[in-house]
A protein has these predicted regions:
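Short proline/glycine- and basic residue-enriched helix-capping loop/turn segments at helix->loop/beta transitions
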Residues: 1-17
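Short beta-strand segments in beta-sandwich/barrel cores
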Residues: 11, 38-43, 62, 86-87
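Glycine- and acidic-residue-biased ligand/ion/polar-headgroup-sensing regions
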Residues: 18, 29, 33-41, 59-60
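Short phosphate-coordinating micro-motif centered on Lys-Gly-acidic
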Residues: 21-26
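Interfacial loop at the N-terminal end of multi-pass membrane proteins
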Residues: 42-56
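Cyclic-nucleotide recognition modules
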Residues: 53-111
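Short, Lys/Arg-enriched N-terminal segment that forms or immediately precedes the first helix
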Residues: 115-124
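Phosphate-/nucleic-acid-contacting segments
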Residues: 129-173
């Protein structure tokens, strides 16, 4: 994203490793553009006391609890910083005033298209590939995840236990 655009409409913010950008149960008020860092999106199930990682984002991506942001409802997921983040944020109200700008409208449509395509690809992957195939795909197409994310989060992202991931890794390596 162009730095001039970011500086004009967005505010620079920093988050430390382990910090929650968005907390489940709170309404999302900001759209973030990750300039640097890594975050994970996860759901926490209090009945099983288990976290499930559903997405991992790196630099140069937009980040928010989209449903909460749009519907003004408490977020069902949390967004946690895995590697220190530098981001640019814009509030909901300010964002709405920008939508009248044709250039920004093009950006918003691009963001929505990107989010929808990623969601559909992720769903297809989980439904059509085995955990081992998903892990091999990550190794080939997204090695940043393997290199930068703790194995317990990778296992959760794939939908398996850490022990099952360990067995997959032994077979591969």
């Amino acid at each position: 994203m162009h730095l001039d655009f970011l500086n004009q409409y967005f505010t620079e913010v920093h988050f430390a490793k382990g910090e929650l950008i968005t907390r489940a149960g709170e309404v999302e008020n900001y759209l973030y553009y990750l300039s640097d860092g890594i975050v994970r999106f996860f759901y926490y199930n209090p009945l099983t006391d288990k976290e499930t990682t559903v997405d991992i984002l790196f630099s140069e991506q937009f980040c928010l609890s989209y449903t909460s942001f749009v519907k003004r409802e408490p977020s069902l997921l949390s967004i946690e910083v895995l590697k220190e983040v530098t981001a640019y944020k814009i509030g909901r109200e300010h964002l709405n005033t920008l939508i009248s700008d044709i250039h920004f409208l093009e950006i918003k449509v691009g963001i929505l298209e990107h989010l929808l395509i990623e969601k559909m690809q992720r769903e297809a992957q989980l439904l059509l590939q085995s955990p081992e195939e998903i892990y091999r795909t990550l190794l080939e197409k997204d090695p940043k995840i393997i290199q930068n994310i703790p194995l317990k989060y990778i296992a959760s992202y794939i939908g398996i236990t850490s022990q099952a991931l360990s067995r997959i890794r032994k077979r591969i390596f």
